[in-house]
Amino acid sequence: MARVKRSLNAKKKRREILKSAKGYRGQRSRLYRKAKEQWLHSMTYAYRDRRARKSEFRKLWITRINAAARMNDITYNRLIQGLRLAEIEVDRKVLADLAVNDFAAFSAICEAAKAALPADVNAPKAA
């Protein structure tokens, strides 16, 4: 079997790695081996965090909805329960957007959710 010389392919591969490692600090942007290690870690972090971003945004939406719901004298979990009972299908992303940008519409949704809840659930807890 003939010997395989890799000079062109190896140079191309190294050039691509160093090109994608631009902006890294110190040796990690200049030396191939360090750049490759950092690039592999970077790709791992990017993959992981693309998935984590989804749950982080959901947490943010829930926090915003809860804050706005409490201004309307209802808690987050009662609001969600009321929306289910009233058969209002609005996802958390839209609810959070309404809470921030159109508070009047959010208040109307809260009132509809309150009306759908059973009477004993709306009553405040006795101390």
Curated annotation (Swiss-Prot):
Signal peptide: none annotated. One of its GO terms (molecular function) is rRNA binding. The keyword DNA repair does not apply. Keywords: Ribonucleoprotein, Ribosomal protein, RNA-binding, rRNA-binding. InterPro entries: Ribosomal_bL20 (IPR005813), RIBOSOMAL_L20_CS (IPR049946), Ribosomal_protein_bL20_C (IPR035566). GO terms for cellular component: ribonucleoprotein complex; ribosome. One of its GO terms (biological process) is ribosomal large subunit assembly. PANTHER family: 39S RIBOSOMAL PROTEIN L20 (PTHR10986). Binds directly to 23S ribosomal RNA and is necessary for the in vitro assembly process of the 50S ribosomal subunit. It is not involved in the protein synthesizing functions of that subunit. Belongs to the bacterial ribosomal protein bL20 family. This is Large ribosomal subunit protein bL20.
